[in-house]
Amino acid sequence: IGVESRSDPLGNLVAHFPGYGPRVMLFTHMDQLGFIVRKIEVDGLIRLERLGGVPERALAAQDVLICVGEGQDVSGVIANKSHHATTALEKYQVTPYAELYVDTGLSCAAEVEAAGIRIGAAVVYAPQAAALNDDRICGTSVDDRAGCAVLLEVARSLKNRTSGPPVDIAFTVLEEFNLRGALPLAQKLLPDIAIQLDLMLATDTPDMEARGEMVLGGGPGMSLYSFHGRGTLNGVIPHPAMVDLFERAATAENIPLQRSAQVGVLTDLSYVQLVGEGVASVDMGFPMRYSHSARELCDLGDLVSLAQLLLAALGQIGPKFSLNRDDYT
């Protein structure tokens, strides 16, 4: 899109758009969850270690891609025990990932190694995407390639603007691994405001309806509360200036803005918010179904509206924009 960018030693990619007022870091992660090759058996079957929060109950019989180099990646399938040999008890059990293995069709360890597969090789869900109806996309790594698509459209618009705050648009790494890839970049940029883009758990399916009111196709979402609660005592409660900003921008642009409050959800913003003397922060995003599975689902209209909302909000941040909490009580 003709925008100058740079990368840091971790692999974060950032583009700076100069301006006046509070400095804004607008970011989303570009990495994806997956696996690492842990062991190659004598018979050529491959054992995996988990990289990120992969759902074990959705792994058996999934197509995967073992990443060994451009044009040389090896396809495989996570094996599923033959149904005819499955006991009545096993039919209702989830096999732990450590007991699963990948079958590449290669017949021995020597053939696997000759294909370039080594311990430590990355393994991902086999990339795929399909249009459902006219306006929905189902595929791998919608989390957070959809967020990347939104930021590309925002960057395309910022390239031609004539006013507004200084904005650093960043595509970050290591979010699915340890949530800290964005941290060194934030320490370098020292933003006043941080806006993070990621999925919002859609709650419009029977298994999720008790979790909230986030509807696919209902517009972008704003998180009012997130807390991991699974060993990582971290989360984000947004700065009141950010809540006020996005509510005003949504009203002005007639964009429906959905609200989320979830336990079990965590983003890298939870660490970015603690940089320096503290950063005024908010998690924004798009509704998505079936998170961390091989097929995630989002609505294109939500992505378009999210890009429009971000641009509208940035347009309201001027040199006198207040981050004083007393102004929002």
Regions found by a protein language model. Give the residues of each.
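N-terminal hydrophobic/helix-forming segments and targeting peptides
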Residues: I1-T329
